[in-house]
Amino acid sequence: MATKFPKFSQALAQDPTTRRIWYGIATAHDFESHDGMTEENLYQKIFSSHFGHIAIIFLWTSGNLFHVAWQGNFEQWVAQPMKIKPIAHAIWDPHFGQPAVKAFTKGGASYPVDITFSGVYHWWYTIGMRTNNDLYNGSLFLLILSAIMLFAGWLHLQPKFKPGLSWFKNNESRLNHHLSGLFGLSSLAWTGHLIHVAIPESRGQHVGWDNFTYTLPHPAGLQPFFTGNWSVYASDPDTSNHIFGTSQGAGTAILTFLGGFHPQSQSLWLTDMAHHHLAIAIVFIIAGHMYKTNWGIGHNIKDILDAHRPPSGRLGKGHKGLYATITNSLHMQLGLALASLGVITSLVAQHMYAMPPYAFMAKDFTTQAALYTHHQYIAGFLMVGAFAHGAIFFIRDYDPEENKNNVLFRMLDHKEAIISHLSWVSLFLGFHTLGLYIHNDTMIAFGTPEKQILIEPVFAQWIQASSGKALYGFNTLLSSSSSIATKAGSSVWLPGWLEAINSNKNSLFLAIGPGDFLVHHAIALGLHTTTLILVKGALDARGSKLMPDKKDFGYSFPCDGPGRGGTCDISAWDAFYLSVFWMLNTIGWVTFYWHWKHMTIWQGNVNQFNESSTYLMGWLRDYLWLNSSPLINGYNPYGMNNLSVWAWMFLFGHLVWATGFMFLISWRGYWQELIETLAWAHERTPLANLVRWKDKPVALSIVQARLVGLVHFSVGYILTYAAFVIASTSGKFG
């Protein structure tokens, strides 16, 4: 008899119902639970899958390069980056009528195309690419790299090339290699690319495979490096009237500390970025030589952790026991990695617009909006994933004996205090923020807008002023012309910073007022509530007063049978499930705020945001409703325009989102009855009953149906907003 799916679970493979298929898919990546899985095999499988993951990423980016080179307008865009819209790829669609063909033929193309809002053109241009040939070369290189990665993944599954368990758990060696090799050397290599290729290209000097071996990136060559006269590399930077991509106004400096932005491209100075990457390379290469391996010198991480014991003794044993706990728990490691990556992704969203690294991207408003929204949503999913794996760690990997009286033990011991404080903060923020908004709504509704409660964010304004913003008149630190910091700053470090922070050509430290104060606290409410749900889920994952034996039921269970009241919806998975709704809610507020404020700034109409953002009807009417007109009018019986595809996607996103509720509200019994009725009808219908099934159809479990509902809710929510952001922004700014 042929073995049935899933091969990794004998018990599931013998299940006579459709549960076999759905549970098989659900547990396909839960390697720990597979039949005959050993710890060593688990590590080897995960290690090999990393190579596959990297191969997919390289294949995807290779495809981007290839399609732009083949069907895009990169060379035309390079000639006029401010005037021409960058093309992602051609559209072939048999449904297109003549009006559609006409509407989507744009960006200088002679056929229907998709415009890209990803910023890749700006990135490729900034790093020195100028021709379609450059793009094809990059595409081919990544394709070869992708094939090598696939081979490496396969190779590391072969008996001779499978690393042993001790290799995976050798933390010091791994840290040294990752810090020095992965971060250090790759940063050094990137510095090399910027200095040898990107900076010369930005000054109108082409450097390619044909001439890079004998083209000096700096007229003085390596002499200043070996003689210690490093300041030569910083002297003669590009001037403020430098035309990007030409020699007009160009300097010779390669490593600078100018601060601020290139006046024409409104992006960070390339020479500043080269300096930044060189500094990071040096720091990480040094960091990668800190840990003790084959030679008896350097730090031992276990010793460091064990030494972290607060001297008063009131905080228990500190970090003692963490070394073994983290080393032996993949979920703990994944949780830490996801949390770090989540924070850095949100920082990327912030810095990509406040300090754009790519030439001319600051003037492509739709790209700015799309990238901010994209990175904030990704950050949200990474953060909730971190807590999910933190909870799985507590259920599957936490050893109370190993962690006696240390920081993990004490977190669990004090969980009531932690959870109740988060609850108190969430309640305080929620009631006060909503109270202020509703008061203001009522005052506007009764025709007395002057009675609104409007609070100036004075502390935030003071922080902006101390960073150099002169607008508020605080006259403190960098915003005071007589302070030591200002005097040092204007001559020694970052002379361009003060000009940039007080310029209205960028999004650095935007002026803030009462509307910002309110939405800031609404976002704080969302963050604290999401955190409350996630922290409670992880800290109660092993057990609670209501259900002390919870850990024995695993990560996701619906209830402990009908006979034990109150045990439904309290698994760690349910906490994750609830948190995703709050995470989406919060990031919705974050992106609404960012987008509306920027839309009004770009339109030269910032008063609209300042006046309408202090009450809820203002948000609904002047942001959502007002900006949805290109989506509501995207197509009609009389014709369409080039936003019609976004209008359709806006509609489709709502549909997907609404489908989620069908699974979230009606539970398993409803579906089971429906399935049995349909099966009965099928078996009695001529012709249809010739089609039989081997597996008895049964409804999804409660947990699975919730997942299906959650996925539809999330995908629909994000798709709807993505269409809204792109259509409303590109509809106004072309």
Curated annotation (Swiss-Prot):
GO cellular component, one term: chloroplast thylakoid membrane
Residues that coordinate or bind phylloquinone: 671
Pfam families with a match to the protein in the record: PsaA_PsaB
SUPFAM superfamilies per UniProt: Photosystem I subunits PsaA/PsaB
Segments crossing the lipid bilayer: 46-69, 135-158, 175-199, 273-291, 330-353, 369-395, 417-439, 517-535, 575-596, 643-665, 707-727
Keyword DNA-binding: no
Chief place where the protein resides: plastid
Positions bound to [4Fe-4S] cluster: 559, 568
Binding site for chlorophyll a B3: 662, 670
Recorded superkingdom: Eukaryota
Cellular localisation: Plastid, Chloroplast thylakoid membrane
Enzyme class: oxidoreductase
Keyword terms, alphabetized: 4Fe-4S, Chlorophyll, Chloroplast, Chromophore, Electron transport, Iron, Iron-sulfur, Magnesium, Membrane, Metal-binding, Oxidoreductase, Photosynthesis, Photosystem I, Plastid, Thylakoid, Transmembrane, Transmembrane helix, Transport
GO molecular function terms listed in the Swiss-Prot or TrEMBL record: 4 iron, 4 sulfur cluster binding; chlorophyll binding; electron transfer activity; magnesium ion binding; oxidoreductase activity
InterPro entries found in the cross-reference section: PSI_PsaA/B (IPR001280), PSI_PsaA/B_CS (IPR020586), PSI_PsaA/B_sf (IPR036408), PSI_PsaB (IPR006244)
UniProt-listed Enzyme Commission number(s): 1.97.1.12
Residues noted as binding chlorophyll a B1 in the record, renumbered to the chain: 654
Membrane topology qualifier: Multi-pass membrane protein
Biological processes, Gene Ontology terms: photosynthesis
Catalytic activity: reduced [plastocyanin] + hnu + oxidized [2Fe-2S]-[ferredoxin] = oxidized [plastocyanin] + reduced [2Fe-2S]-[ferredoxin]
Cofactor binding note: P700 is a chlorophyll a/chlorophyll a' dimer, A0 is one or more chlorophyll a, A1 is one or both phylloquinones and FX is a shared 4Fe-4S iron-sulfur center.
Cross-referenced NCBIfam families: psaB (TIGR01336)
Family: Belongs to the PsaA/PsaB family.
Subunit (UniProt): The PsaA/B heterodimer binds the P700 chlorophyll special pair and subsequent electron acceptors. PSI consists of a core antenna complex that captures photons, and an electron transfer chain that converts photonic excitation into a charge separation. The eukaryotic PSI reaction center is composed of at least 11 subunits.
Cited function: PsaA and PsaB bind P700, the primary electron donor of photosystem I (PSI), as well as the electron acceptors A0, A1 and FX. PSI is a plastocyanin/cytochrome c6-ferredoxin oxidoreductase, converting photonic excitation into a charge separation, which transfers an electron from the donor P700 chlorophyll pair to the spectroscopically characterized acceptors A0, A1, FX, FA and FB in turn. Oxidized P700 is reduced on the lumenal side of the thylakoid membrane by plastocyanin or cytochrome c6.
Full protein name: Photosystem I P700 chlorophyll a apoprotein A2
Annotated organism of origin: Gracilaria tenuistipitata var. liui
Gene that this polypeptide is encoded by: psaB
